[in-house]
């Protein structure tokens, strides 16, 4: 179990309160698919992912980005049991979807970059970044828990 300080809990809640999943999710997932094009293989049913403009304008990318960020809401609400909260999601990605778990780290990095660009250095300070990174590392580890 991860130990969270009161300050860390406050920072996570504060950042989460500023996030609009309808905006942040699509941008973060699009960034993943553009910067790391090999991740597109998991989204072959999404249609045209041939270039950045196609990815940014793809409604299936946008919709799934919202789902991904919405999934983080569960981790925010269950900070003391992220692994248990994500057990079924981890199993789905491992057993059914066969997603390489290293891609979760790439997506977390894309989400962090998206947030830093959105909020700027006055809000997304190094101290906030540190806590947010810890939170995402816990979420990524929980998603990878069911992999063998």
From Swiss-Prot:
Red blood cells. PROSITE patterns: GLOBIN (PS01033). SUPFAM superfamilies: Globin-like. One of its GO terms (biological process) is hydrogen peroxide catabolic process. Keywords: Heme, Iron, Metal-binding, Oxygen transport, Transport. Residues 3-148 form the Globin domain. Heme b binds at residues 64, 93. GO terms for cellular component: blood microparticle; haptoglobin-hemoglobin complex; hemoglobin complex. GO terms for molecular function: haptoglobin binding; heme binding; metal ion binding; organic acid binding; oxygen binding; oxygen carrier activity; peroxidase activity. Involved in oxygen transport from gills to the various peripheral tissues. Heterotetramer of two alpha chains and two beta chains. Belongs to the globin family. PANTHER family: HEMOGLOBIN FAMILY MEMBER, HEMOGLOBIN SUBUNIT EPSILON. This is Hemoglobin subunit beta. It comes from Silurus asotus (Amur catfish). The lineage of its organism: Eukaryota, Metazoa, Chordata, Craniata, Vertebrata.
């Amino acid at each position: 179990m991860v130990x969270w300080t009161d300050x860390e809990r406050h920072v996570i809640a504060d950042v989460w309160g500023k996030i609009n999943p309808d905006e942040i999710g699509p941008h973060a997932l699009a960034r993943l698919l553009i910067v790391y094009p090999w991740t597109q293989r998991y989204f072959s049913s999404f249609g045209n992912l041939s270039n950045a403009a196609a990815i940014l304008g793809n409604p299936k990318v946008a919709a799934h980005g919202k789902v991904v960020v919405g999934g983080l809401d569960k981790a925010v609400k269950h900070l003391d049991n992220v692994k248990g909260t994500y057990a079924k999601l981890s199993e789905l990605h491992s057993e059914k979807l066969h997603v390489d778990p290293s891609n979760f780290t790439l997506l977390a990095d894309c989400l962090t970059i998206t947030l830093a660009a959105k909020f700027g250095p006055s809000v997304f300070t190094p101290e906030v970044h540190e806590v947010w990174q810890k939170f995402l590392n816990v979420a990524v580890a929980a998603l990878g828990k069911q992999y063998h």
